[in-house]
């Protein structure tokens, strides 16, 4: 399955405006969700076309 990684940065001037970035945060989450969905769709397409080769390559690289 897909995993989402989050990078947190230390404090700064941006923390001085409480609630000011709520809309920007929501927009960023929506963009990340859209990008993730696109990536998963691409993976699904590859697996539909060539699942056997994908599994064979995965096992050769040490996957279980």
From Swiss-Prot:
Protein modifier that is covalently attached to lysine residues of substrate proteins, thereby targeting them for proteasomal degradation. The tagging system is termed pupylation. There is a cross-link at residue 64 (Isoglutamyl lysine isopeptide (Gln-Lys) (interchain with K-? in acceptor proteins)). Residues 21-58 are annotated as: ARC ATPase binding. Residues 1-38 are annotated as: Disordered. It holds the Pfam family Pup. Belongs to the prokaryotic ubiquitin-like protein family. Keywords: Coiled coil, Isopeptide bond, Ubl conjugation pathway. The lineage of its organism: Bacteria, Bacillati, Actinomycetota, Actinomycetes, Mycobacteriales. Is modified by deamidation of its C-terminal glutamine to glutamate by the deamidase Dop, a prerequisite to the subsequent pupylation process. GO terms for molecular function: proteasome binding; protein tag activity. This is Prokaryotic ubiquitin-like protein Pup. Strongly interacts with the proteasome-associated ATPase ARC through a hydrophobic interface; the interacting region of Pup lies in its C-terminal half. There is one Pup binding site per ARC hexamer ring. The N-terminal unstructured half of Pup provides a signal required to initiate unfolding and degradation by the proteasome but is not needed for pupylation, while the C-terminal helical half of Pup interacts with ARC to target proteins to the proteasome.
């Amino acid at each position: 399955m897909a995993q989402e990684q989050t990078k947190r940065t230390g404090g700064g001037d941006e923390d001085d405006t409480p609630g000011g970035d709520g809309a920007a945060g929501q927009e960023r989450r929506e963009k990340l969700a859209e990008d993730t969905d696109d990536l998963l769709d691409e993976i699904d397409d590859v697996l539909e076309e060539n699942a056997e080769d994908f599994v064979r390559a995965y096992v050769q690289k040490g996957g279980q």
